[in-house]
Curated annotation (Swiss-Prot):
It comes from Gibberella zeae (strain ATCC MYA-4620 / CBS 123657 / FGSC 9075 / NRRL 31084 / PH-1) (Wheat head blight fungus). Residues 313-338 have a biased composition (Basic residues). Induction: Expression is positively regulated by flbD. One of its GO terms (biological process) is conidium formation. The keyword Transcription regulation applies. This is Developmental regulatory protein wetA. Belongs to the wetA family. Transmembrane segments: none annotated.
Length: 608
């Protein structure tokens, strides 16, 4: 009866234990050597059981030796599985030591199938063997059974709490070469919590592994690199091109030249807006480039139905990774080809091409995705092979300009690749060309894409209405005709029209010049008169807009607003007039005091 109560917890727990439950993600899940065993530090591997586990309870010295047949009945079943990878080449006592100590931690694990009564806190000391003496009669009530009654539970808890490490140390020291068994049996709660945590983690990770295994290799690389490596056998028939060193597996047939936009692939498979570049060739010049292009998977909506280069006109409706032989250009995104759909609404879809298809171009990546977007290099220009590419002019007229240049920059993913030296670009935040295009193309393209010119001027015969204010000339410069084609502007300076400001200013300036002792004919006086006269020349005839020229500097500087110098000049003139008035009044008073006739003097022309 006591033997049954001993062995039953081992049997139940051992059968239910998963030998490789520690890390489900390890490829070699059946690692049976103790080096990968996490609980190795909590297990006593010594081969002398009676002395190493002798005195764990000082109160039961009369515990008889449990029969060797207890463990020799099923040594491999109860120990190889219960100790989770403990080597079975140890002797029988060592096996029993391992299993008896592991069993203290096993009942608390949540995945076990033991009865709930046996999964309470059971200290390893309550399961230890005594000194080869007899088995106590009450000992079997403290040993965990499959079913344990509630009154016995406090006794088990009491045993786990009243153990003293002082008795255990001197007996286990001489025969135990591994000191962790004296240190790690004390925190039983810690061992149980740790084992249950690992058990839960392994149960949570367990369903994730088959998902990564069963997932088909998608060109978007949603599966991790290891999952790609596990599926090597699925694509052996399709590996036309060798896998690139920068990619993770034979899915790299979709990435022919070893290009991987993002190893972690968080790029959404969204269809961005219509994105085109400004060009300086006019409004009917298409805007597409082999050097910098949209991602191959990001087809614009209006591209659907456009027949592209002749090498793409084969009739298989494909998500691309299953036909890598037919496509030498990578398609990192799964999509049914838009150019395989109906060509409704685009009658001018054919692109006449003279010479080989552009899959012979460097990089094998260029596709004229939109016939309306055949770029500036197609306008009677040579491609990289030195052959002309002709585009229907009707397609050029249908090309429209998308002013949202920032959308192109925002929706293109970054490149995590060392750029080719031939890709001559600024490399600021614009994704660089993926193929080995010529530097001349990239230089011209970067000049046009980084600094887009103003919108082209549509040809028209009527003149633009000029801006009403002189300061708005800079804003309307791109829309107004070139300055050289205008009629020579008539500056408002050489005018003879005098207003009241002009007359008053002239008299005042002449008076001030004479009052200061300056002859009116001197250059200073003439400059003052001309300056005061210029202030009135704002309205010349019926001109609604005055086009100022460099000769209008005097008018612009003096006639706009009174500056500090003009205010000072006016103040000095007022002061001089006040002095002259006071002087004349003083002279008149002096004449009157002398008895002279002031009126007679003024009649004779004497000016005070």
């Amino acid at each position: 009866m006591p033997m049954a109560s001993w062995t039953l917890p081992y049997r139940v727990e051992a059968v239910d234990r998963d030998p490789g439950f520690y890390w489900q993600e390890i490829e070699d899940g059946h690692n049976n050597d103790g080096s990968a065993d996490f609980f190795g530090q909590f297990i006593n591997f010594d081969s002398e059981i009676p002395s190493s586990m002798a005195d764990h309870h000082g109160h039961n010295p009369g515990m008889p030796t449990l029969a060797d047949g207890l463990m020799l009945d099923h040594p491999s079943e109860s120990t190889a599985s219960a100790s989770s990878g403990v080597s079975t080449t140890e002797d029988e006592f060592d096996l029993f030591s391992c299993s008896s100590q592991v069993d203290a931690t096993v009942p608390s694990q949540p995945g076990s199938s033991a009865a709930p009564g046996a999964s309470h806190d059971v200290d390893p000391r309550s399961l230890a063997l005594a000194d080869s003496s007899g088995l106590m009669v009450e000992k079997h009530s403290m040993v965990p059974r499959v079913s344990m009654s509630d009154p016995e539970l406090p006794r088990v808890d009491g045993i786990s709490l009243q153990s003293s490490p002082g008795r255990r140390v001197p007996v286990s020291q001489p025969s135990s070469p591994t000191p962790p068994n004296t240190m790690t049996r004390k925190p039983n709660k810690f061992v149980e919590a740790l084992s249950s945590t690992i058990r839960k983690a392994s149960k949570l990770r367990k369903p994730r592994k088959p998902i990564a295994m069963d997932r088909p290799g998608s060109p978007t690389m949603d599966n991790p690199p290891r999952a790609l490596r596990l599926q090597h056998h699925e694509y052996n028939g399709n590996d036309v091109f060798p896998p690139s060193p920068t990619t993770c597996g034979p899915d790299s047939t979709n990435f022919v030249h070893g290009f991987c936009d993002d190893p972690f692939d968080e790029i959404p498979q969204q269809h961005p807006n219509n994105m085109r570049f400004f060009k300086t060739n006019g409004i009917h010049t298409p805007a597409e480039s082999p050097g910098i292009k949209t991602e191959p998977g990001m087809y614009q909506p209006e591209m659907a139905g456009q027949a592209v280069w002749p090498h793409q006109q084969h009739p298989h409706p494909h998500p691309h990774p299953h036909h890598p032989q037919a496509h030498t250009h990578p398609h990192p995104h799964p999509h049914p080809h838009p150019h395989q759909q109906a060509v409704a609404g685009h009658p001018q879809h054919a692109v006449p091409v003279v010479g080989p298809a552009p899959e012979t171009w460097p990089g094998h990546e260029y596709m004229a995705q939109n016939a309306h977007q055949s770029g500036w290099w197609d306008l009677n220009l040579l491609n990289q092979n030195g052959e002309y590419v002709v585009v229907d002019p009707q397609q050029q007229k249908n090309a429209n300009l998308n002013l949202a240049m920032h959308a192109q920059h925002a929706e293109l993913p970054y490149e995590y690749q060392v750029h080719d030296p031939n890709s001559a670009g600024l490399m600021i935040h614009m994704p660089q060309p993926r193929n080995d295009s010529t530097p001349a193309h990239d230089l011209a393209l970067n000049a046009q894409t980084y600094l887009p010119p103003p919108p082209p001027i549509p040809p028209t015969t009527e003149r633009h209405r000029p801006p009403r204010a002189p300061s708005s000339g800079a804003r309307h410069l791109s829309c107004s005709p070139i300055r050289k084609t205008r009629q020579p502007s008539i500056p408002p300076t050489p005018t003879t029209v005098h207003s009241r400001h002009s007359s008053n200013g002239s008299v005042a300036s002449a008076r001030s010049a004479s009052g200061r002792g300056m002859v009116p004919g001197t250059p200073t006086a003439m400059r003052k008169q001309r300056r005061s006269r210029d202030s009135s020349g704002g309205s010349v005839g019926d001109i609604g807009f005055v086009n100022f020229t460099p000769s209008d500097g005097g008018l612009l500087m003096t006639g706009v607003a009174p500056s500090g110098s003009s205010k000072t000049k006016a103040r000095r003139e007022r002061e001089a007039m006040e002095r002259r008035r006071r002087l004349s009044e003083a002279a008149m008073k002096a004449v009157q005091a002398a008895g002279g006739d002031v009126d007679k003097l003024m009649e004779q022309g004497f000016a005070f």
